[in-house]
Amino acid sequence: MVVGKIIKISGPVVVAEGMKGSQMFEVVKVGNEGLTGEIIQLTEDEAIIQVYEETAGIKPGEGVTGTGAPLSVELGPGMLKAMYDGIQRPLNEIENATDSIYIPRGVSVPSISREIKWDFEPIAAVGDEVITGDVIGTVQETASIVHKIMIPFGVSGKIKEIKAGSFTVEETIAVVETAEGEKEIMMMQKWPVRKPRPSKGKQAPVIPLITGQRVEDTFFGLAKGGASAIPGPFGSGKTVTQHQLAKWSDVDVVVYIGCGERGNEMTEVIEEFPHLDDIKTGNKLMDRTVLIANTSNMPVAAREASVYTGITIAEYFRDQGLGVLLTADSTSRWAEAMREISGRLEEMPGEEGYPAYLSSKLAQFYERAGRVECLGSENKQGFVCIVGAVSPPGGDFSEPVTSNTLRIVKVFWALDANLARRRHFPAINWLTSYSLYIDDIAGWWQQNTAADWRSLRDEAMSLLQKEAELQEIVQLVGPDALPDRERVILEIARMLREDFLQQDAYHEVDSYCSPIKQYHMLKIIMTFYKKGLDAVAKGADPAGISAVTVKGDIARMKYLVEDEFVNTKVPEIINKMESELGALIK
């Protein structure tokens, strides 16, 4: 064990001498209080350490003790419903142990409880040959999730002993005979956060992640295993959009990272999720959620750790064959922490003071998303979707964090302050946003909704773009000076914006919209467009088309329950539309 001595302190960065024999990214205990830190640079016998706790009060001459291990997370039953800080310390346990609402410095509490006993049910039997990733048993961790206990990395052989019953995460549940001797298996594993968990290989992202948000699903779809960015200025709805994704996404587990944002946003999640039902299982949303809270008043160095801790936990659930959504709010705060530490290390700054390695760090994080074939002899498939919020100062998308993120991700949901000011939510700008997965996921949509889904979606997008072109003319000469056909286009584009793209996150029905309902809503609006054009071509007045009463039914369709809407209202609206538009023809 290496023991060194502090010679310099600069905010969260500490320099220690006498550290020969230490390794890069080794965890060390700093000062008399044993603050947790990580070695980020080594020079002969000097080590530069980023400390994950407040360094006020420590002084040169105090000791630094190496642990010989990299920053790792504990993986096993007990993570769901938990709330951790950036280095996986359980906040509830710390509060109970210290009777304080603040995290005392140097506190050390196990990430996963060592007291709770879990009912382990074996799947494998004595004599079975097992390899890394094989599931040997299960634990019913929450009402929603059956936790699969897997053979840890680097272990393969024959099961010599396996037992059912109630065990803590550190007790032996099985013994495997390997070439190197007997290995005891327990429910808990440890994994270094900076090392991606291995898999057999990545698969093509061809299945969409259904979020229940019409603008995201229909227009700018994200594939399962994909990565998306949500950049937007302050007050444009980034956090509410991420909360909606965490609530309604078609996944088994949600890992929500609050990285350098306000504490009240995490409080909102803690207060809301235990009362909301998961549409997939009917159980509470909190049963499938892991929260990592690294709020803006916590030490900046831990922001980087929180992002890596979150993605490692997500990969662990992925390896069980589950679908995982990881939301990071906000990656800009992580980048700002990198900039601060880079400045204290006196490194050459890059664009806007960010370090030159900003883009490679972002890429390392986003590239850990993916749909994979999991390790093990079974045919398990899992995926991790990453949705990262970006907070560009002043809404400037050309700043380094946003521009580097856009080079890596394939879905860009651009939040617009002007839309937010007009109370259009979600404030995703349909002219600047894009998805590069549309060609990959179109097959799923056509199979699960209707064959004309892609043509409807493309036509609706072109109408919205046409409206933007016509707006300049309208502002100069007014809508009445336009040809009849273009007046119809303006009316349909308005219906698309207000009746389809706008969605109320706080309405019990409109908060989530299924793929079938999304398709029928779009189909009705586009049918109105075609029939409106036919009516105008046959002599109808565009002003009359704008005044038909069926438009009120179309505006209300988002608030109808899916069964009632699809089975009853769709044919009614189509019939009413045909009769009212037909009556306008001279």
Swiss-Prot record:
Enumerate the GO terms in the molecular function aspect. Answer: ATP binding; proton-transporting ATP synthase activity, rotational mechanism; proton-transporting ATPase activity, rotational mechanism
CDD domains in the cross-refs: ATP-synt_V_A-type_alpha_C, ATP-synt_V_A-type_alpha_N, V_A-ATPase_A
Q: Where does the chain bind ATP?
A: G232, P233, F234, G235, S236, G237, K238, T239
Q: What is its EC number?
A: 7.1.2.2
- What does the entry give for GO biological process? proton motive force-driven plasma membrane ATP synthesis
The family database entries (Pfam families) matched by this protein are listed as:
ATP-synt_ab, ATP-synt_ab_N, ATP-synt_ab_Xtn, ATP-synt_VA_C
InterPro entries given in the database record: ATP-synt_VA_C (IPR055190), ATP-synth_a_Xtn (IPR031686), ATP_synth_asu-like_sf (IPR023366), ATP_synth_asu_arc (IPR005726), ATPase_a/bsu_AS (IPR020003), ATPase_F1/V1/A1_a/bsu_N (IPR004100), ATPase_F1/V1/A1_a/bsu_N_sf (IPR036121), ATPase_F1/V1/A1_a/bsu_nucl-bd (IPR000194)
What reaction is this protein's catalytic activity? ATP + H2O + 4 H(+)(in) = ADP + phosphate + 5 H(+)(out)
Location of this chain's protein in the cell: Cell membrane
Keywords, comma-separated and alphabetical: ATP synthesis, ATP-binding, Cell membrane, Hydrogen ion transport, Ion transport, Membrane, Nucleotide-binding, Translocase, Transport
Q: What are the disulfide bonds?
A: none
State the annotated membrane topology for this chain. Peripheral membrane protein
Q: Name one GO cellular component term.
A: proton-transporting two-sector ATPase complex, catalytic domain
Q: Which HAMAP family does the record match to this protein?
A: ATP_synth_A_arch
Q: What does this protein do?
A: Component of the A-type ATP synthase that produces ATP from ADP in the presence of a proton gradient across the membrane. The A chain is the catalytic subunit.
Q: Which PANTHER family does the record associate with it?
A: H(+)-TRANSPORTING TWO-SECTOR ATPASE (PTHR43607:SF1), V-TYPE PROTON ATPASE CATALYTIC SUBUNIT A (PTHR43607)
Give the UniProt family note: Belongs to the ATPase alpha/beta chains family.
What's the subunit arrangement here? Has multiple subunits with at least A(3), B(3), C, D, E, F, H, I and proteolipid K(x).
**Protein name, please?**
A-type ATP synthase subunit A
Tell me the name of the encoding gene.
Answer: atpA
